[in-house]
A protein has these predicted regions:
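Post-Walker A helix-loop "phosphate-sensing" segment adjacent to the P-loop in P-loop NTPases
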Residues: 68-98, 134-136
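The catalytic "switch" region of P-loop NTPases
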Residues: 159, 167-173, 178-259
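Dynamic helix-loop-helix/coil hinge segments at AAA+ ATPase domain boundaries and subdomain interfaces
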Residues: 10-29
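C-terminal alpha-helical "lid" subdomain
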Residues: 1-5, 13, 21, 55, ...
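A short hydrophobic beta-strand->loop->alpha-helix junction that borders the nucleotide-binding pocket
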Residues: 80-86, 110-119
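Pre-Walker A adenine-sensing motif
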Residues: 29-41
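Walker A/P-loop nucleotide-binding motif
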Residues: 44-64
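Short glycine-rich substrate-engagement loop in P-loop NTPases that contacts/grips substrate
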Residues: 116-150, 169-171, 175
Length: 365
């Protein structure tokens, strides 16, 4: 069946399912896999870190690894009893690998927990309990720890992925910013569960004050954006070729040609998340307009909508050769202007809030 005979809804949905297995993605997935395989191999658990800027594919790698483990469990036996898949609406597949074991309850080999902003030491235990399906607000910290130990063992949890771990370092609610290291250390020592922390580069900062947790760390992997390289074996071109082949069009776009690859790299700074976003938006436009493929003009439209910039600041609108350094300077100038405007706006809002508070205080006096 060709793509042009399929429904618009099916084609648009397919766009969101793309995962490219690039060397960068494979290295990250390997870190998750090694961490998972080390479960109960030693006297104590270990932890690993996968860090990088937003858009390099950290969460995508984690989700891809979870899908791999889900396939391993599907149709297998545990203690002689079949395990069955769970409705993803009840237990989202991007937050856990969860199965139902008839007569025994849930089996969750992997959990993924999104660390909230302004988290606290106690809240980290609370978030873990909620992920285990045991939310509790009234329990003491000691009770929480006991329930966590019991549920991790009972549900067969082998590994927990903590995403957005930089929030632990950022949080002003933790008295000692490295208190979180003790949380992870306790979790690994008392339950022997494997831990993988995902976040921005500085998510590893809380290791600095905790030598024991540093000893328990197995790996620290930094994901980085694609470098600008037009060689066919380079990651950028490999990724763009894979993305081109996957798009739901019978006439595949040539995203990997030097002219378009350069513009995609300039627009995204090499971050896979941004490249995918621009191309996905353009692909959906092409489907809605009944066009036979994705064009540079469509990607330019997507870039303009996303960033609200004039044509001279849109790399897909520049005809002929494009000045790489010149365009980077234009982007930097635009960002500086936006940051200055945001700073002025925040200052104005704060001044108005102070004036409002003073008026209220004066009226109450």
């Amino acid at each position: 069946m060709t793509w042009n005979t399929r429904s618009v809804e099916e084609r648009r949905k397919h766009i969101g399912s793309f995962v490219a297995v690039t060397p960068t993605m494979k290295r990250a997935t390997d870190v998750f896999r090694r961490c998972y395989r080390e479960y109960h191999e030693g006297q104590q658990a270990s932890c690993s870190f996968v860090v990088g800027e937003t858009g390099v594919g950290k969460t995508t790698a984690a989700n891809d690894f979870m899908e791999e483990i889900r396939e391993e469990y599907r149709g297998t036996l545990k203690d002689g009893i079949d395990v069955h898949t769970i409705d993803p609406k009840t237990y989202p597949t991007n937050m856990s690998v969860t199965f139902q074991q008839p007569g025994r309850g849930l089996v969750r080999p992997i959990l993924k927990i999104m660390v909230s902003k302004k988290t606290t030491y106690k809240q980290l235990f609370g978030e873990t309990l909620a992920a285990l399906g045991m939310p509790t607000k009234r329990a003491t910290l000691a009770e929480m720890k006991s329930i966590v130990r019991h549920q991790i063992e009972g549900q067969g949890v082998r590994m927990i992925i903590f995403d957005e771990c930089q929030h632990i370092v950022d949080s002003s609610q933790i008295r000692d910013p490295y208190e979180a290291a003790d949380f992870l250390k306790e979790l690994m020592k008392e339950t022997r569960v494997q831990i993988c922390c995902v976040g921005l580069h500085y998510a590893t900062d809380f290791l600095l004050e905790n030598g024991q947790l540093e000893t328990m760390k197995s790996e620290e992997h930094h994901m980085r954006p694609f470098p600008l390289d037009f060689n066919e074996s380079a990651e950028l071109c490999m990724f763009l070729r894979s993305l081109s082949d996957d798009l739901p069009f019978d006439r595949k776009p040539q995203l990997f040609t030097p002219a378009l690859a350069l513009r995609l790299h300039l627009a995204s700074d090499g971050y896979v998340g941004y490249i995918t976003k621009y191309v996905s938006m353009a692909a959906k436009d092409a489907i809605d307009q009944n066009l036979d493929t994705v064009t540079m003009d469509l990607i330019g439209d997507a870039y303009a909508r996303k960033h609200n910039v004039p044509d001279k600041e849109n790399p897909f609108r520049v005809k002929g050769e494009i000045d790489e350094d010149g365009f980077q300077k234009i982007k930097a100038a635009r960002r500086k202007m936006l940051e200055e405007e945001a700073c002025k706006s925040r200052a104005t809002r704060r001044r108005k809030d102070r004036e409002k508070s003073l008026r209220k205080a004066a009226a109450a006096a």
